[in-house]
């Protein structure tokens, strides 16, 4: 399941300073691909891990290019891709509509990753907001996220400077940043996604690499192993605060973060729906909820 990892190799692609709060003892590298349904399925776990233990780690998303190795998938029929997505949705609880491969297939596997790197040029948080919007457009709305107009729409929804984003999309900087991610992926010998690699402050210690999707408690145990003690989890914020921050979430995400069943999460969300705090958004597999922001003009 997990394996010891010798450590980060010397590379200009690694940040010269730890990301975010330099007092945090752990650094986590999450290897993903924006087209990967299993990476999308890990979102509830990452949200919960960040809320409960984020004070102990910085998290860096690395685009692995795994799905972008398109030549290996050219022989895969759209029907098989669609079936794989449906299977992933049923297994993870995060909806993804496989019929996109039959109706509106992604025309280029590299464009979404380059777009994410272009968005990151407006800041790490901007990049993460853009990644989320891109995933929503792909997995829920069945949009071809290699299309420039779709990517521009994602940029608008993520609150980016769209003109700057479109310029950066075709800049050497975005391409170089993506190449850095591919180099890190190769150096850390990542050949499956999602993969999480954990390092602590002691550069002589081995890291831990875990590939695939696992129950939440497994990731907590890995953090405890790297810290050398079992930390107390932080409590999640009030539900309305959580929704106000993330804006658009799945019932599955609410259930995981608050340790509720899907039915319990649905019940709590319906209470907020009656108060006109959220809007229910049915999707192919389950339900999403959009926060209604009364503070907007």
Swiss-Prot record:
It is found in: Cytoplasm. Pfam families: Thioredoxin_5. GO terms for cellular component: cytoplasm. Keywords: Cytoplasm. CDD domains: DsbA_FrnE_like. Disulfide bonds: none annotated. Adapter protein required for efficient degradation of Spx by ClpXP under non-stress conditions. Interaction with Spx stabilizes Spx and exposes the C-terminus of Spx for recognition and proteolysis by ClpXP. Belongs to the SpxH family. Monomer. Interacts with Spx. Contains a DsbA-like thioredoxin domain connected via a linker to a C-terminal domain reminiscent of the winged helix-turn-helix fold. This is ClpXP adapter protein SpxH.
